A protein has these predicted regions:
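Gram-negative bacterial Sec-dependent N-terminal signal peptides
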Residues: 2-32
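Conserved active-site regions of diverse hydrolases
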Residues: 33-441, 454-461
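Active-site pocket-shaping loop/turn-to-helix segments
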Residues: 142-143, 256-267, 557-562, 619-631
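Residue-level recognition of beta-strand termini and adjacent short loop/turns
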Residues: 236, 481-485, 574-576, 643, ...
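Extracellular loop and loop/strand-boundary signature of outer-membrane beta-barrel proteins
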Residues: 305-309, 460-464, 498-504, 512, ...
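Outer membrane beta-barrel transmembrane domains
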Residues: 403, 514-518, 611-729
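Outer membrane beta-barrel translocator domains of Type V secretion systems
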Residues: 419-581, 589, 708-726
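Solvent-exposed flexible segments
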Residues: 588-594
Length: 729
């Protein structure tokens, strides 16, 4: 519950003037710096998300390092995105008597304050006390909300919705006409009447039902009184974060009204908010489930019956939300409940005091801690999970923010798995090229040969960190003399590549199989190959950090396949010489498929579900992915005369690349059954493997059996290359 002082009578709520300021400010869009992963983070939620609209419900940092803020704001910091609240510049923090209201002062001062707030347009719409209905309301605005749910009552809403700006006070169209004296704000008398009834639901409902005042249930935390979608068009790179449900469960606990029907209704509001965002064009939508309310100090002190009752509400709400969100599709659920359960089960592992954290808090609960509490012998909120009876301390908020960040960015690293398989295929291709180029315009020959290549690889592109590491391939082949001027062969190889920037290790091992052939008629030549790769990713290791203390490495493995085809043709432009040289063109195609997998974790990092099953809230399950790579080359070749003691061979070319240089990857949390969403993963346009470049391969025969070659590829962002050998028995 939230309490407000009596509004200062000097505050002027002049309808026409305020409407004029708002209308003047509308149409100006905020500008956020482009980020490689997400453009902006837009937050809707309750006190676990509120960054100042109704307050900030957590502790101060004892060391003064971190600002007082909720977990989504820590997430915004790590993503490098804006985090201001949607009513930034208004409300009690800036002198206003109530949330989203201007400070007392002259008319011009209030107009300027409101205009500045609208222009700032902070992306955090969280409001302490919000229920799930209020999250939907803030997303779609009053008009659309009433179309979707015309029958909500005070019981469905945060009491603050009665006094926040509401564009429906300006008429059905939601557009305030200053000439008609319309305003989204209440008069001072109406504010007084509404706030006086905050602790009396029946009295507040009577005010809402009274047609003779402007008190409504559809106020939103924005000075125009309009919701997010009526004023904004989602951009494909925006990330939408929704969190609510805890207050709905608490209401049911207090009133003894928890039921499957009530929790399903509460979940429906939240899933509908996700559905409305998706329908409007939002691409990345994530939600948290609700924490186990019975394990908070607000309920825990009441005994086992209250704990079990409250936690049954959490179980029902989270299950209904999961089912509904899965029906909408492509919305990721984060296991807030599970992470907090891990912390409460073993607080010392996460940097908190090794005590029963559910039974105590820093301040304002039944049992503030006698040592670390605000009035304890050694006050230190960082040693406690709970700030008050419900909300986490700043240390807890930061831990949750780290969890959100680690989960929402994991797809970036996993998106490099196809590239590792492709890098191995390229090394296999180097060995085939070494054989085909060195034998160009030579008589077909039946033999067995061995090859090996070692290459310098630059893996990582777009949001993925660049990491250089050698890749190698050992090749065994057989060639056969066919009919006149034709040689064909088969080969197999084993190759390996590794990608290991900080906190991530990916290793690919390829078993490659190819069939190849070459033909010439002393003028034209054609060669090509087709191949298949059996790829094993036995080392997929991701390390996460939560807070200052907790560190854990996840292990996983999976398999994949690779397919390839290539064709090259050219002609000898120096037929009067013993050597051969001329132009050529070539085309290569590779496809890499990677199967899905689940990260594995320790049993100590799981919690018990409703039926005793172990649930892993930190590990992820990753869906399969595939990627096409295409290369086209045009250049010149050279082969020295057959009579030369050391036969030189080589190619020089310009190459153009294409393929799947942009991809998202399906990610889900292990503990959330059958829920997943596609998150930003691979962004390699004009970078990484998808750069055009200039390349060359030059080799020489040391003797009749042994050849050595070097290859080099110069691209705008890097230079890669390597060495290869070929021995014919």
């Amino acid at each position: 519950m939230f309490f407000f002082g009596t509004p200062n009578k000097q505050v002027s709520y002049l309808p026409g003037a305020l409407s004029l300021a708002i209308c003047t400010a509308l149409g100006v869009s905020p500008v956020y710096a482009e980020e490689p992963l997400y453009r902006s983070l837009i937050v809707f939620g309750d006190s676990l998300s509120d960054n100042g609209n109704a307050g900030i419900f957590t502790s101060d940092d004892p060391l003064g390092i971190y600002p007082r803020q909720p977990a989504p704001s820590f997430l915004a910091d790590r993503l490098g995105l804006a985090k201001e609240n949607s009513c930034y510049g208004l409300g009690p923090r800036f002198g206003g008597a109530i949330p989203c209201a201007p400070a007392p002062g002259g008319l011009d001062q209030q107009l300027q304050q409101i205009s500045n707030s609208v222009l700032t347009n902070g992306p955090n719409w969280g409001v302490g006390g919000n229920r799930t209905a209020d999250v939907l309301l803030d997303v779609v605005g009053p008009q659309r909300f009433r179309q979707l749910f015309p029958d909500t009552t005070v019981a469905d809403h945060n009491t603050l919705t009665t006094i926040l700006p509401d564009s429906s006070r300006c008429g059905e169209d939601g557009i305030c006409d200053p000439l008609a004296g319309e305003s989204p704000y209440l008069s001072p008398a109406e504010v007084l009447a509404a706030t006086a009834a905050f602790n009396d639901p029946m009295a507040l409902q009577a005010l809402v039902d009274d047609p003779n005042n402007n008190i409504t249930l559809t106020g939103v935390p924005f000075a125009t009184g309009q919701g997010y979608l009526p004023q904004n068009t989602p951009v494909s790179s925006d990330l939408y974060f929704l969190n609510a449900g805890g207050n709905n469960i608490l209401d049911g606990v207090r009133n003894g009204t928890l039921s499957l029907m009530s929790m399903e209704r509460a979940a429906t509001f939240l899933s509908t908010a996700g559905s409305e965002l998706k329908a409007a064009g939002a691409k990345y939508v994530v939600m948290t489930n609700a924490p186990a309310i019975g394990n908070t100090p607000a309920v825990y002190s009441q005994g086992a019956a209250a704990i079990n009752y409250a936690n049954s509400g959490t179980e029902m709400f989270n299950d209904r939300l999961r089912r509904q969100v899965n029906d909408v599709g492509n919305i990721l659920l984060l296991d807030l409940e599970g992470v907090l359960e891990l912390v409460l089960d073993n607080p010392a592992a996460f940097g908190f005091a090794d005590i029963n954290q559910s039974d105590t808090c820093y301040v304002n609960c039944a049992n503030p801690h006698p040592v670390y509490g605000a009035n304890g012998t050694d006050p230190n909120a960082d040693m406690l999970v709970f700030y008050d009876a419900i909300h986490p301390t700043l240390a807890g908020q930061r831990l949750l923010g780290d969890y959100y960040y680690e989960t929402l960015t994991a797809a970036v690293g996993f998106g490099l798995l196809p590239d590792l398989g492709y890098q191995n295929s390229r090394q296999h291709r180097v060995n085939i090229d070494h054989h085909l180029i060195s034998q160009r315009y030579r008589d077909p020959f039946t033999t067995v040969f061995f090859g090996a290549s070692l290459g310098h690889a630059e893996l990582g592109a777009g949001p993925a960190l660049n990491d250089d590491y050698p890749a190698w391939d050992g090749f065994f082949g057989m060639s056969f003399a066919g009919f006149e001027n034709l040689e064909w062969g088969v080969g197999m190889s084993y190759g390996r590549s590794v990608y290991e920037p900080r906190n991530l290790r990916l290793k690919s091992r390829n078993f490659n199989y190819s069939a190849f052939a070459r033909w010439d008629n002393d003028f034209w030549f054609v060669d090509g190959a087709v191949g298949f790769s059996d790829i094993k990713y036995r080392d997929i290791n991701r390390t996460i950090y939560l807070g200052d203390t907790f560190r854990h490495r996840f292990n996983a493995s999976t398999k994949g396949d690779g397919y390839s085809a290539s064709l090259r043709a050219g002609y000898d432009a120096s037929r009067n010489l013993d050597s051969h040289m001329g132009p050529f063109v070539s085309a290569e195609w590779n496809r890499i498929d990677v199967n899905g997998f689940n990260e594995k974790t320790s049993i100590n990092l799981t919690y018990a579900g409703a039926y005793g099953e172990r649930r892993d809230p930190l590990g992820l399950w990753v869906r399969g992915q595939d990627r096409d790579f295409r290369r086209c080359k045009a250049g010149f070749f050279y082969n020295s005369p057959k009579s030369a003691e050391h036969q030189w061979f080589g190619e020089f070319w310009l190459e153009h690349t294409a393929g799947d240089d942009y991809a998202d990857l399906g990610i889900g949390v292990n503990s959330i059954f059958n829920n997943w969403a596609r998150l930003p993963s691979y962004r390699s346009k004009n970078t990484g493997f998808f750069q055009n470049g200039v390349g060359a391969m030059v080799g020489v025969s040391v003797n009749d059996k042994f050849r050595v070659a070097a290859d080099l590829l110069v691209r705008p962002e890097d230079t890669v290359g390597g060495l290869s050998i070929n021995y014919r028995f």
